[in-house]
Amino acid sequence: MSSIEKRVKEIVAEQLGVDEAQVTNDASFMDDLGADSLDTVELVMALEEEFDIEISDEDAEKIQNVQDAIDYITEHT
C-alpha cells in the first residue's frame, strides 16, 4: 500500500467516523460508508489540506469512492 493510499484511508475513516477496516478501495463514500453531501465536502477539504492540492468542484463530484480519491491525489501531487 502506498503512503498516499494509507493516508487517504486514514483521512476517510477519521472524517466519516468509520473503522479503517471498512475503508476499502472500492468503498463508495455515500453508499458504503454512509457519507452525506456535507461529509463529502468536508472530506474533500481534508484531502486538499493534507496533500496541499486544490480539487475543483467539478473534479470533487467525480470522486465517489476511495480509489477515485487515491487516483486523483496520485495524479495531482
From Swiss-Prot:
It comes from Geobacter sulfurreducens (strain ATCC 51573 / DSM 12127 / PCA). NCBIfam families: acyl_carrier, PRK00982.1-2, PRK00982.1-3, PRK00982.1-4, PRK00982.1-5. Pathway: Lipid metabolism; fatty acid biosynthesis. GO terms for cellular component: cytosol; membrane. This is Acyl carrier protein. GO terms for biological process: lipid A biosynthetic process. Belongs to the acyl carrier protein (ACP) family. It is found in: Cytoplasm. The keyword Zinc-finger does not apply. InterPro entries: ACP, ACP-like_sf, PP-bd_ACP, Ppantetheine_attach_site. Residues 2-77 form the Carrier domain. Keywords: Cytoplasm, Fatty acid biosynthesis, Fatty acid metabolism, Lipid biosynthesis, Lipid metabolism, Phosphopantetheine, Phosphoprotein. The gene is acpP. The modification O-(pantetheine 4'-phosphoryl)serine is found at S37. Pfam families: PP-binding. Carrier of the growing fatty acid chain in fatty acid biosynthesis. Gene3D superfamilies: ACP-like (1.10.1200.10). 4'-phosphopantetheine is transferred from CoA to a specific serine of apo-ACP by AcpS. This modification is essential for activity because fatty acids are bound in thioester linkage to the sulfhydryl of the prosthetic group. The keyword Lipid biosynthesis applies. GO terms for molecular function: acyl binding; acyl carrier activity.
